Amino acid sequence: MIKKEMIAMLLAGGQGSRLGVLTSKVAKPAVAFGGKYRIIDFPLSNCINSGIDTVGVLTQYQPLRLNTHIGIGIPWDLDRNVGGVSVLPPYEKSQNSEWYTGTANAIYQNLEYMEQYHPEYVLILSGDHIYKMDYKIMLDYHKANNADITIAAMPVPMEEASRFGVVVTDNDNKITEFEEKPEHPKSNLASMGIYIFSWKVLKDALIKLKDQQECDFGKHVIPYCFNNNKRIFAYEYNGYWKDVGTLSSYWEANMELIDIIPIFNLYEEFWKIYTKTDTIPPQYIAKDAYIEKSIIGDGTEVYGRVFNSVIGSGVVIEEGCVIRDSIIMNNSHIGKNTTITKSIIAEDVTIGENVELGVGEEAENVKFPKIYNSGLVTVGEWSVIPDNVKVGKNTAISGETTLQDYPNGELPGGGIIIKAGDN
């Protein structure tokens, strides 16, 4: 009989709609990050660094890039005969076939997968957070408290607490109150969406709540267990943790990597972040190029000037270009004499010559002000921007655009271009 002390279930099926055009063709956990990685690399690396060798990755929205990236788990040493990594999409059953309708529903639909390992504990993770955590220490804490559930939590500014599940604890860190995104939070200790369940407690709750519409851990499972007097503890985490679910937080997390002393260090030998790497040549920096305080990916060619930016692999930045405070993802091409300021350029984008991105004053986005609201220019995958155009702040572009899409050669601040077939 196969028996694992703890297995991990990694929720990676989310669309990430608050990232706008960045996730129109790819799931949020598969979005590129830090010039080399994808967001899902961080929880996967945490698992293997914590000694967890059995991970189920639950996918749904736009799964192809994610499936290809994970493969059989070789970069994370998760290509195992017993355990390893398994990609778990919704699958057709003999009856009641359905998509995953909530975080807990997704786990419920994979009870059989978990059962085969006879785990003592199950670790529930989100695939869209940037952080380093030793889950073994959290498990030791769970055991020491004889807990049924342990929730990783961290202090946040009180004004931001209403965005999270909030916990109130006693002097022993036992949770006495739990509220999911309360309007008037009683505490600033926020759930990180990382849970350790004793297996029997998790299984019982999922079965009892199987008919709950859009069953979710924060909204349903935790309150159910709390109301049934389960021992629920908060594991307080004080390291770096970033939910990169908005354009501003995604941009900030990338920019934090290039600080002189980064608060999130990718270069630590004792806690490596693993990823799938392609066989590509080294970067090339031309004689007249200039780079200051930036990350430059493998295979990238720089002929222009780059300041305070994160550049992925296989990017070409032509002569006369000036890139500032921006993220340019893999395999994008920036034409000659183009200026890019505070922008996020997704993968495989082509930008013409003499283009200016991020000019003028900020204006509220005309269509999606809650998404495009941090002064950024956001360009989706496979987009094309023609020569000689100017693009203002709080804008979004997706698709193969032509000069006709830019009246007077300009997309003013707050504007948006989404071509047919892109959303």
Swiss-Prot record:
EC main group: transferase
Database matches in HAMAP family: GlgC
Binding site for alpha-D-glucose 1-phosphate: 100, 165, 180-181, 191
Known pathway: Glycan biosynthesis; glycogen biosynthesis
Family affiliation: Belongs to the bacterial/plant glucose-1-phosphate adenylyltransferase family.
Record EC number: 2.7.7.27
Gene Ontology annotations of biological process type: glycogen biosynthetic process
Keywords, ordered alphabetically: ATP-binding, Carbohydrate metabolism, Glycogen biosynthesis, Glycogen metabolism, Nucleotide-binding, Nucleotidyltransferase, Transferase
Originating organism: Lachnospira eligens (strain ATCC 27750 / DSM 3376 / VPI C15-48 / C15-B4)
Subunit structure: Homotetramer.
Molecular-function annotations in GO: ATP binding; glucose-1-phosphate adenylyltransferase activity
UniProt name for this protein: Glucose-1-phosphate adenylyltransferase
InterPro entries, A to Z: ADP-Glc_PPase, ADP_Glu_pyroP_CS, GlgC_bac, GlmU/GlgC-like_hexapep, NTP_transferase_dom, Nucleotide-diphossugar_trans, Trimer_LpxA-like_sf
Protein function: Involved in the biosynthesis of ADP-glucose, a building block required for the elongation reactions to produce glycogen. Catalyzes the reaction between ATP and alpha-D-glucose 1-phosphate (G1P) to produce pyrophosphate and ADP-Glc.
Reactions accelerated catalytically: alpha-D-glucose 1-phosphate + ATP + H(+) = ADP-alpha-D-glucose + diphosphate
Highest rank taxon of the organism: Bacteria
